[in-house]
Each structure stands twice: as structure tokens, then as C-alpha cells.
Amino acid sequence: MAHPPLEPIEALASATAQSLGFLMESVVLHSHRAPQALIVAVRKGDGSDVNLDDCASFSQAFGEALETGELLTGAYVLEITSPGLGDVLQQDRDFRSFRGFPVCVRQRDAKGGEIQREGTLLGRDADAVELNLRGRIQRIPRSDVLEVRLTSPSA
């Protein structure tokens, strides 16, 4: 099955989320599955936690909008989630929202390999991701950062 363009689906998800007081975080379409799976992550605009009822209300409104817009052909599964533990931070707002949270940064080392560092996220700017690593501040150049993922606090 051909992968439909994501831009119109993302635009519809964003508009639907905004109309309900949510922010659309991400849209992922797994068109290789049978049935295909559309996974949309939302968060509340006021920063409070998303609950099951929130996911259900967004699912109903977005599902109806998808059907009306005929953006997906064939059968599909619609899954609504919220960002949380284990999620990859990508957008600037993610780095602002999760400042002070424990993260794992996967980065390139000087020899071209990969290393992981776990610490507390202090922020991200145009040049670097800044972490507190056991009391020491470290700036990791963004060009070396492969992934920043939320983790659970170390014991």
C-alpha cells in the first residue's frame, strides 16, 4: 500500500487538537501494517496531564475529521497517545517542558562511535544540549547529538 502524504494528516490533527485545547506532538503512520496504524501524540495546551477521557474525545473528533476528509484509504487503526517516559525529545517545546527531567543522550564520540550519557536536562539552545551530569554541567554540541530520550530517575 502506498504511503499517503503525512502533511495533510498532520495539519488536520493539529487543527483538531487546537480546537479541543490540545497541542499535537507527533503523527506517525505505519502503512506497512495490515491494517495500517495512525498514531497521534497530543498534550494539553495548559501543560496538565492527558488522561484517557482526553484521548477518547480527541480520537472521536479526529476520527470523524479523518473520515470526512478521506485522507486515508482502506482500513486503519487510530491510536491516540500522550508524550511521556521513554519518549524522544525533538521539538524546542519538548526541551522547555522537560527541563529538570532525567534524560539519556545518545551522541557521537570523537572516533565516530556512539556513547550514551544520563543526566538532568538543563536545556537546549542553537548550539548545544546542556546536561547536569552528577553535579557537573556539560554542553554537548547539537551536531553530535543523535537522540535525547526521557528516562526514569536513577536509584
Curated annotation (Swiss-Prot):
CC annotations in GO: cytosol
Domain of life: Bacteria
One protein family per Pfam: RimP_N
Entry-linked SUPFAM superfamilies: YhbC-like, C-terminal domain (SSF74942), YhbC-like, N-terminal domain (SSF75420)
UniProt keywords, alphabetically: Cytoplasm, Ribosome biogenesis
Entry's localization field: Cytoplasm
Gene Ontology biological process terms in this record: ribosomal small subunit assembly; translation
Disulfide bridges in this chain: none
InterPro entries on file: Ribosome_maturation_RimP (IPR003728), RimP_C_sf (IPR036847), RimP_N (IPR028989), RimP_N_sf (IPR035956)
Family the UniProt entry places it in: Belongs to the RimP family.
Job of this protein: Required for maturation of 30S ribosomal subunits.
The protein, known as: Ribosome maturation factor RimP
Organism taxonomic ancestry: Bacteria, Bacillati, Cyanobacteriota, Cyanophyceae, Synechococcales
